[in-house]
Each structure stands twice: as structure tokens, then as C-alpha cells.
Amino acid sequence: MLTRVLFVLVLLGASVPASAEEAKVLALGITDHQVAQEELDKGVALPPPHFNTPAIAYASVAGLKKGDTIEITLVNGDTPLLRNTETLAEDSQSFLLQAGKRGVPAGGWPEGSYHAALKVTRDGKMLIEQSSQPIPFD
């Protein structure tokens, strides 16, 4: 009897879709310039934005499939400021998406703690919902 129960558990575990395991966040954060994948691959810390510099939220995600939707948002506190959404036309080993402003708003960025918010959906289901550590713009 125990053998049958274990066999059923193994079958159930094997039949669970691996979609959530396949997609993973490689990099997520905010910096003061538009980044390239090569820059993120080096693993060097990127400079944080300040109230008087550009601010770009970025996310690099691996294991995405055709039809997946990836969304990156630059957020101040609980207020979304700038958002970029992309639906993939084909499978992608890694995908970099950015949202932000390459210029500086008149008078600088408003006070607050900023973070990058990432959402990845597949077939209408949330695969990944993650935020970077909040940082103040000084």
C-alpha cells in the first residue's frame, strides 16, 4: 500500500507544470542609466539614481516562453510612475526590460523611496511578482 501511495505522489509531482521553475529573475533594480544585458552579466553593482539624475527600473528574466507577459514598473512608495509591458513573440533564454526616464523631471524626482516592481504572467497566471529593495533618491 505504501508503495502505491509513493508511486502516486511521484506521478503527481512529475505532472506539476515546471513553468514557475523555468522562469527566474536574473537581475532586478533601479539605476541612473539605461543598461545592457552585458553590463548586468558582469555582476557589478550599478550606480543608484539621485533626485537630479535619470532613473531606470530594469529586470532581466530567464526561461520565458512565447506569449509570456513581462511588466516592469518604476514605483515611488506605492505610486507607480513609469511602466513598460512586453508580450513575448517567441521563447527567450533571457529578456531585459526597462522602464524609466532618461532625463530628469523639472525640479528633480519627488522625495520618496523608489523601487522596481516586476510581474511575469503566463497563460493569465502570475509566475513572478517581485520588487527590488527600496532606495531613497538623495
Task: Please report, for each region that a protein language model flagged, where it lies by residue.
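N-terminal signal peptide c-region/cleavage motif recognized by signal peptidases
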Residues: 13-17
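Aromatic sugar-binding surface patches on proteins
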Residues: 91-104
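Short beta-strand elements
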Residues: 126-138
